[in-house]
Regions:
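Glycine-rich phosphate-binding loop signature in dinucleotide/nucleotide-binding domains
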Residues: 2-4, 96-101, 126-128
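Residue-level signal for inorganic ion chemistry
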Residues: 10, 36, 92, 106-107, ...
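Short phosphate-binding loop-to-helix
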Residues: 69-103
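Acidic metal-phosphate-binding loop of nucleotide-sugar-dependent transferases
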Residues: 85, 108-112
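Short, charged/polar "capping" segments at the starts of alpha-helices
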Residues: 58-66
Length: 233
């Protein structure tokens, strides 16, 4: 059986309002390189990746093309994003070549994610899982509360995971999930697959797959990158 062809959708279309920069968050610098450039490099470092599609703000397409230039035999494309995250993912999915079998969806804000995590997610999908997400055990106690702030339940930590990206899917599954999406906001593509009633496998995540949401998050990873703890290539 031929190895599946892997395509990566890098979501970089958000305005990054919580970050508060004068550019979209994907174009914020981290030790001399943008978050977008680092995320694309990590995706290209995954064996078997045939295409990377960057979904960028329509007013930053030229900048995204400059930052997303890659090698390793993969094709890099840049397309404009939509109003909501799911619109942007759908645009990236539609731009992938038709012979891509496995789709990884990655947030550009997780710019220190190692290529090995991309490879692990892709391998789990290739092994038969329709949808795969990386996740880390939760260290804090998590309490469910009602609309008044009163605790309803303390959730068992052993059953909880903090989910990261890239998230991986069989292409047909992700296309079905987006086609069937109902109104309302979703925070990740795995939730759309869950709504279809299909299983989503969680594999071990990586502490390096930080999501940079605020300047404080960026400060926390600068030292890691500068010390070589995260891939700076």
């Amino acid at each position: 059986m031929a190895e599946p062809r892997v395509g990566v959708v890098v979501v970089a279309a958000g305005a990054g309002a919580r970050y508060g920069a004068d550019v979209p968050k994907a174009f914020v610098m981290l030790s001399g390189r943008t978050l977008l450039a680092r995320s694309v490099a990590a995706a290209l470092g995954c064996p078997g990746v045939a295409c990377v599609v960057v979904v960028a703000p329509s007013s930053y397409l030229a900048e995204a093309e400059r930052e997303a230039i890659g090698s390793a035999g993969a094709t890099v494309r840049v397309v404009p994003g939509g109003v909501e995250r799911h619109d942007s993912v759908a645009a990236g999915l539609a731009a992938l070549p038709r012979d891509v079998d496995v789709v990884l969806v990655h947030d550009a804000a997780r710019a220190t994610t190692p290529s090995s995590l991309f490879a692990a997610v892709a391998a789990a999908v290739a092994a038969g899982a329709p949808a795969v997400v990386p996740g880390l055990p939760v260290a804090d106690t998590i309490k469910q509360v009602d609309e008044t702030g009163t605790v309803v339940e303390t959730l068992p930590r052993a059953t909880l995971r903090a989910v990261q990206t890239p998230q991986g899917f069989r292409r047909d599954v992700l296309e079905r999930a987006h086609a069937a999406r109902l109104s309302g906001s979703v925070t990740d593509d795995a939730a759309l697959v869950e709504a279809l009633g299909l299983p989503v496998l969680v594999i071990p995540g990586d502490p390096l797959a930080h999501k940079i949401t605020t300047p404080a998050d960026l400060d926390r990873v600068v030292g890691l990158v500068d010390s070589g703890g995260a891939d700076a290539e």
